[in-house]
Amino acid sequence: MTDDYEKLLEKAKNVLSSSTKNIDRLKIPDPEIIREGKATIIRNFQDIVDIINRDPEHIIKFLTREFGTNIVQNGRRLIINRKLTLEELLDKMNEYINTYVRCYECGSLDTEIQKSGRISLLVCKACGAQHPIHSVREAKDDETIEEGKEYVVEITEVGSSGEGRTNYKGYTIFVPGAKRGETVKVRIKKVKNDVAIGEIIERSKQEKK
């Protein structure tokens, strides 16, 4: 049975790879920094902004809060009134991207922020997922799934071989025997990278009727 799950996992990875290989075409360059006195300057700031398609003022507000110093944009450059290392900048830029840009489900960078009342939603143009924006620090302790554990998921699509699929906590879970729109409790049998195989252990009462 273990071999069967291994084969199914490899098949799932191949299917997912072929269907999503062109989704995430965006490549974000590392900040190019120079120092002038006590200031750190990101020379390619606007290039980064153009790629992630976010309001530069939104990014500046985030970095100002994180670094606790004055930050201004000058043309295509960003001037930070503090000495920073490349590692410090990368850490905060990655935190911004993982919170406000990268899809929480499929990982695509092709997203936009939309308002729904007072709630800001991260909407993915690649997979269609919509989620309230939350800090990556808030989700860090609950961002993985584990073999042997049980999760309740809603099946969002069915593959050509009849297996149900869903995105959950950044993983694509393949669930043999599940139908689209069905809510099921699954036990994770195998996990590899961001792909998992789940076994149905309970269907919702509504589905049983």
From Swiss-Prot:
GO BP term (any one): regulation of DNA-templated transcription
Zinc listed as a keyword: no
SMART domains: eIF2B_5
PROSITE patterns: TRAM
Domain TRAM: 144-202
Keywords on record: Initiation factor, Protein biosynthesis
GO function terms (MF aspect): sequence-specific DNA binding; translation initiation factor activity
PANTHER family on file: EUKARYOTIC TRANSLATION INITIATION FACTOR, EUKARYOTIC TRANSLATION INITIATION FACTOR 2 SUBUNIT 2
Biological role: eIF-2 functions in the early steps of protein synthesis by forming a ternary complex with GTP and initiator tRNA.
Assigned protein family: Belongs to the eIF-2-beta/eIF-5 family.
SUBUNIT field: Heterotrimer composed of an alpha, a beta and a gamma chain.
Protein name (Swiss-Prot/TrEMBL): Translation initiation factor 2 subunit beta
Species annotation: Thermoplasma acidophilum (strain ATCC 25905 / DSM 1728 / JCM 9062 / NBRC 15155 / AMRC-C165)
